[in-house]
């Protein structure tokens, strides 16, 4: 993990009910390393395991900033010393616009809830979430993916 332009990385953490995701990105926005783990109802242990895997026994590189999102964002932010903690509506909107700049609608089916986000002029205009704990929507998709061998 050597950043040739300028030493330093940014750490992104997303702790959800199904998965824990960590990404280490250099100052140019290039992904240096990413980790995907099953949360398994143990968000703290999953985060610690992810941080250990991210460094793979090496000294942690210079982290210029860290951010946390997901249903476990507050917990992850405190444990990792995040500089910023953002809700999933905001992070989905920003991420989607990085991939598709003129995106207008985002639909997300998660382990706990489902969301629809409407953007106007690059800003979240409206959003809605289901009112019942997902009724297993994300968990259902997760099980089907496992049956198909999709990580």
Q: How should each PLM-predicted stretch be described?
A:
Residues 2-28, 103-120:
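Gly/Thr-rich phosphate-binding beta-strand-loop-beta motif of the actin/hexokinase/Hsp70
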Residues 7-45, 49, 127, 131:
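Short glycine-rich, Thr/Ser-proximal phosphate-binding strand/loop in the N-terminal lobe
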Residues 24-26, 77-81, 116-122, 128-130, ...:
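Short acidic, glycine/serine/threonine-rich loops at helix termini
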Residues 35-39, 55-89, 125-127:
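Short beta-strand-loop/turn "lid" adjacent to the catalytic site in phosphate-handling enzymes
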Residues 43, 121-151:
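Glycine-rich phosphate-binding loop plus the immediately following alpha-helix
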Residues 46-49, 53, 75, 95-98, ...:
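Alpha-helical scaffold segments in soluble metabolic enzymes
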Residues 86-107:
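Active-site cofactor/substrate anionic-group-binding motifs, chiefly glycine-
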């Amino acid at each position: 993990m050597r950043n040739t332009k300028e030493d330093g990385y940014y750490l992104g953490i997303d702790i959800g009910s199904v998965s824990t995701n960590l990404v280490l990105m250099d100052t140019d926005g290039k992904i240096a390393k990413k980790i995907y783990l099953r949360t398994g109802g143990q968000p703290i242990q999953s985060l610690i395991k992810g941080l250990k895997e991210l460094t793979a026994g090496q000294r942690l590189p210079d982290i210029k900033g860290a951010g946390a999102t997901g249903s476990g964002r507050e917990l992850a932010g405190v444990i990792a010393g995040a500089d910023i903690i953002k809700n999933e509506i905001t992070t989905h909107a920003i991420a989607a616009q990085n991939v598709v700049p003129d995106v207008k609608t985002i639909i997300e089916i998660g382990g706990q809830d489902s969301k629809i986000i409407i953007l106007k002029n690059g800003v979240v205009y409206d959003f809605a979430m289901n009112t019942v704990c997902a009724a297993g929507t994300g968990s259902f998709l997760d099980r089907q993916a496992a049956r198909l061998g999709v990580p």
